[in-house]
Each structure stands twice: as structure tokens, then as C-alpha cells.
Design a protein with these regions (language model features):
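Outer-membrane beta-barrel "beta-signal"
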Residues: 125, 150-162
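Transmembrane beta-strand segments of Gram-negative outer membrane beta-barrel proteins
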Residues: 22-31
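Gram-negative (and chloroplast) outer-membrane scaffold detector with strong preference
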Residues: 39-119, 123-138, 142-144
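Sec-dependent N-terminal signal peptides
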Residues: 4-16
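Sec/Tat signal peptide C-region and signal peptidase I cleavage site
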Residues: 16-22
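Extracytoplasmic electrostatic interaction patches
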Residues: 145-149
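Short polar catalytic/cofactor-binding loops
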Residues: 31-37
């Protein structure tokens, strides 16, 4: 058991020392995920090319099912939502390839056409993804964001790092 803990500690230490060679900032178009159907996100590291970072964005979603981020009584008609997803994340990996682990919250306004009364809502999610990001230029991510509403949010992003 001690050997397993020692090996795990060494592996985490090595990953941490070789992590986050990605550029400090990027702007991404996110399809699906915590942005709803589509959104724009800004991602940055807290300090230089540090492994800890954050992401914030603005998204739009459309739904005619039970996948709204807040419960809507009646379930008549379709729902439109405008959301602001915010996230803290950590990058593992080196060079241009990274494993992203994060957690965040999505805050927003939802209007169900059958109810027509805007509702404020939130949802909390995790983020598990692969990120390809050059120091300057093309950035790409693919992953999923499991959340409290038991909805599986796969997503893909395309963007530009600078």
C-alpha cells in the first residue's frame, strides 16, 4: 500500500511539473456543453502558463425536452435560455496536448414558451476533456460535462489561443 501511495505521489508530481505549456489565453466557440447549444468562452491561466485557470462565457440554448437547466412547470412549448458558464480548471500534460479537469456553474435565464415567465436558474457541472492548444493559433477541445441535473453534456470547442 505504501508503494502504491508513493508511486501515485511521484506520478502527480511529474505531471504537475510538466503541465500547462499552453498559452495563457484563448477564445473558443463551444458547441453543446455548458453553453447550451452554442456559446463563446474566454479561457485563461491565473498566472503566466500556470496549470490552474478559469473560463467564462456566454451561451444560448434551445430545448423542447426535459434537458433545461432549471425545472419548468407545465413543460408546454419550447424553452430558450441565455447562460453564463464559469469554471475553474486544471491542465495536465505537456506541449500542445492536455487533459482538462474542472468544475463550474452555469447561471442563466430560461423562458418556456408555454409559461412565458422568465426564470433564473443555475446548474453545477464538472469538466473532463482533451485539449489541443498551440502556444499561438488553433485551439481545440472535446469532452463532456456531467452535471447535477443528470444530463450528460458532450461538447466540442474550436478557438484561437494568443
Amino acid at each position: 500500500m505504501k508503494r502504491i501511495l508513493l508511486l501515485f505521489s511521484i506520478a502527480v508530481s511529474l505531471l504537475s511539473t510538466h503541465s500547462a505549456k499552453a498559452q495563457t489565453r484563448s477564445v473558443n466557440l463551444e458547441l453543446l456543453g455548458s453553453s447550451g447549444m452554442a456559446g463563446v468562452n474566454y479561457d485563461a491561466r491565473f498566472k503566466g502558463n500556470y496549470v490552474f485557470g478559469y473560463s467564462a462565457g456566454l451561451g444560448y440554448g434551445y430545448s423542447n425536452s426535459n434537458f433545461d437547466f432549471v425545472e419548468t412547470p407545465g413543460r408546454d412549448g419550447v424553452s430558450h435560455q441565455v447562460v453564463v458558464p464559469v469554471e475553474l480548471n486544471y491542465l495536465f500534460g505537456k506541449n500542445n496536448n492536455h487533459l482538462v479537469l474542472g468544475a463550474g456553474a452555469m447561471l442563466g435565464v430560461l423562458v418556456n414558451e408555454g409559461v412565458m415567465k422568465p426564470r433564473l436558474g443555475y446548474n453545477v457541472f464538472a469538466d473532463i476533456a482533451y485539449r489541443y492548444q498551440k502556444p499561438s493559433g488553433f485551439a481545440f477541445s472535446i469532452g463532456f460535462k456531467p452535471n447535477l441535473r443528470e444530463v450528460f453534456w458532450p461538447y466540442i470547442t474550436f478557438g484561437y489561443s494568443f
